[in-house]
Design a protein with these regions (language model features):
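N-terminal Lys/Arg-rich, disordered targeting/topogenic segments
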Residues: 6-35, 624-643
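Alpha-helical transmembrane segments of integral membrane proteins
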Residues: 375-644
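His/Asp/Glu-rich mid-to-C-terminal helical/loop segments that flank catalytic regions of hydrolases
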Residues: 313-386, 572-573, 578-580, 584-604
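Hydrophobic membrane-insertion alpha-helices, especially the h-region
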Residues: 42-58
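Short, Lys/Arg-rich N-terminal segment immediately upstream of the first membrane anchor
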Residues: 27-41, 405-410
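Soluble extramembrane regions of membrane proteins in the secretory/endomembrane system
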Residues: 62-361
Length: 644
């Protein structure tokens, strides 16, 4: 019997060991270590399929307008236009706003227009240019009366940056403007050679704008004054370069010219140049909708609800000022685009109402995807994050995790960033930063490259003061449990969801910038127990959207390392609106809380028992106690003296 026991005992132990559940290699889904419902997150991505299908059915091919009646061959004179451009660039190399050369150049334009029997109407105005101050500017308008008061406009900025002759940018556009006006001079006087003998259906405005190099100040003023009459507008800028023609369709808002206007312009250029003009890539178009920005004059016109585009041979930034000499003008390209603009104007005169207005879209080859369909896809891409974040919050509530201290911790970080934003805005009002109209700054200007170090030092000092006050509530004082860390993640993700909804309310296309942070940072609670480098990689992925915007400005506009300051300047001049600025600060507060969790420096907002006096109250308490001590010492000395 003892032998049987000796045999059965090991057998029994082995059997129990065989039936024991295996140790888990990873945490159970739904636990504190793996709180994100990955299955729910993956499943909600199926919701994006329906908007994608709708977007596919929204793809269409816009059609171009053609002139309703036969027209004469284009009468644009290549030699005369090239001579005008060279004369303007050589005689007035400095046409920067407010300079004597700008005044003389305006008189030169008026004289050239007078030679073809037309008159110029002067429209003076003032504007503040960052780095230059308040300056007197003037638009020059040549009007060709039509059978309708509704108007078409051709714009070309007369000014330049002042550091080069500005032959291509934009003496070429001004020369083409004069040649285009010449072909309609018969309507207002004796026709010069090559002039049209047909009165236009629409009133025509040929506008030499001022301040075009500084955000399109003149175009903005003209569009504001004539928005009720304008049907559409075309800007000519740097059209005598050696590159092929290019269409700039982006605006300063998430609106573009109607696709029919773009197609009509492209068709007229193809007829004269033998090739279609270049357009931005699909990714660049999406980025321009997410962060609307352009240096060309169609931008402010589109802001006023008037369809407009720019024809150019330059890039996003324009030609380098020092190399923009009369000797480098391409007369052949100037003639091609000039004749294209002439035929475009005739086509628009017959049917501009069919291509007026603004819309949003993205070109894919010869076809376009409608903006509303893209917005629908982007909003649908927000849903997986929202649903997963709400599910995480519900799980935390069921576990009775301390969400309130985590929300208060986020509130403290948000107040810190709002303090930094308030100081920045106060400095802007005080003139510490260069200020001006709410338009893009010239990348060539000193304001775009000069960092006001003294002002930035003051901003940093006041920000540090705000952080010292805030840090007393955020510094870890004890070991933080995994439940408190999860609550901190949940509070930050809820705030991030609010940021996403606010972006939808302002500009749904801007979700392109925010979505990487939403979908990357959602998984930070899931990797909280992983090594630091894993957490840091997931955290860094959330900055992909803002980094792409920063790189885009640095590369496309030649800003390089000055791109961060340039973006800050856009905030200072209110090109970036206050609501968008506040949304950005809210996003930074989320990044701050998640960053603290990533590196293990997070602490929930302290309870009343844990709370210490802040630095200000501590200093006041120390001062009061010191004053009481001094008074007590003086009183004791007086009593001893009286007793002695």
């Amino acid at each position: 019997m003892p032998a049987q026991v000796a045999v059965s005992a090991p057998y029994y132990s082995l059997g129990m060991a065989a039936n024991r559940p295996p140790a888990r290699a990873r945490a159970r889904p739904g636990s504190l270590e793996r709180p994100i419902n990955a299955r729910l997150y993956r499943g909600t991505w199926l919701l994006v399929g329906i908007p994608l299908l709708i977007a596919a059915f929204s793809v269409g091919k816009p059609t171009a307008l053609r002139a309703a009646v036969p027209t004469l061959p284009p009468a644009f004179d290549k030699a005369r236009a090239t001579a005008l451009a060279r004369d303007l660039a050589q005689t007035f190399p400095d046409r920067s706003p407010g300079s004597p050369g700008a005044v003389s150049a305006r008189q030169w334009f008026a004289d050239q227009v007078a030679k073809i029997g037309l008159r110029v109407r002067r429209e003076p105005f003032t504007a503040t240019i960052p780095g230059r101050g308040r300056i007197q500017l003037e638009n020059l308008i040549v009007t060709i009366p039509g059978r309708s008061p509704q108007a078409l406009a051709v714009l070309a900025h007369l000014d330049n940056i002042g550091t080069g002759p500005g032959a291509n940018d934009n003496a070429s556009g001004v020369a083409a403007l004069i040649e285009l006006a010449r072909s309609y001079a018969s309507v207002s006087g004796s026709p010069p050679p090559g002039a049209s003998i047909v009165s236009p259906a629409h009133t025509l405005f040929f506008v030499a704008t001022d301040g075009g190099e500084f955000g399109g100040l003149g175009a903005d003023k003209f569009a504001a004054d004539f928005r009720d009459r304008l049907v559409t507008a075309v800007a000519l800028d740097s059209i005598a370069g050696h590159g092929t023609a290019r269409l700039v369709i982006a605006g300063n808002t998430a609106r573009q010219a109607a696709p029919g206007l773009v197609e009509t312009t492209a068709a007229r250029i193809q007829e004269q140049a033998g090739a279609l003009p270049r357009r931005p890539s699909a990714f660049a178009q999406l980025l321009d909708l997410a962060f609307p920005f352009t240096l060309y004059e169609q931008g402010p016109v589109l802001t006023h609800g008037v369809g407009a585009l720019t024809i150019t041979t330059a890039g996003d930034r324009g030609p380098p000022p020092f190399a923009d000499t009369p000797q480098r003008l391409n007369g052949g390209r100037l003639a091609q685009i000039g004749r294209s603009a002439q035929e475009l104007l005739r086509a628009l005169d017959q049917g501009a109402e069919l291509v007026q207005g603004t819309s949003s879209y993205v070109y894919l080859g010869a076809r376009v995807i409608r903006g509303w369909a893209i917005e629908l896809v982007l909003i649908a891409a927000l849903l997986p994050f929202i649903i997963a974040a709400v599910d995480l919050f519900a799980r935390c509530r069921r576990r009775h995790l301390p969400i309130a201290p985590a929300l208060r911790s986020y509130r403290s970080r948000l107040l810190f960033w709002l303090w930094v934003g308030l100081v920045f805005e106060v400095f802007a009002l005080a003139g510490v930063w260069p200020t001006g109209a709410a338009l893009p700054l010239s990348p060539h200007s000193s304001a775009a490259h000069h960092w006001p170090l003294l002002g930035l030092f003051g901003l940093g000092a006041l920000a540090a003061l705000g952080w010292i006050v805030t840090r007393s509530r955020l510094a870890p004082r004890r070991a933080v449990g995994i439940d408190e860390e999860l609550a901190g993640h949940t509070a930050a993700l809820l705030a991030l969801g609010v940021v996403g909804l606010l972006v939808v309310a302002t500009n749904p296309f801007a979700l392109l910038i925010v979505l990487p942070s939403l979908h990357a940072w959602l998984w930070l609670p899931q990797v909280q127990s992983r090594p630091l480098w894993v957490r840091a990689a997931v955290y860094a992925a959330g900055f992909l959207g803002p980094v792409i915007v920063l790189i885009s400005f640095a590369a496309r506009y030649g800003l390089g390392l000055d791109a961060p300051w340039y973006l800050a300047e856009l905030v200072a001049v209110r090109f970036v609106s206050i609501p968008v600025f506040v949304i950005g600060l809210t996003w930074l507060a989320v990044a701050g809380q998640l960053g603290a969790l990533t590196v293990g420096r997070y602490a929930p907002y302290p309870s009343a028992d844990e709370r210490r006096l802040g630095p200000i109250r501590s200093a006041l308490r120390a001062a009061v106690l010191a004053q009481r001590t001094r008074r007590r010492t003086v009183s004791d000395e007086r009593q001893r003296a009286a007793g002695g």
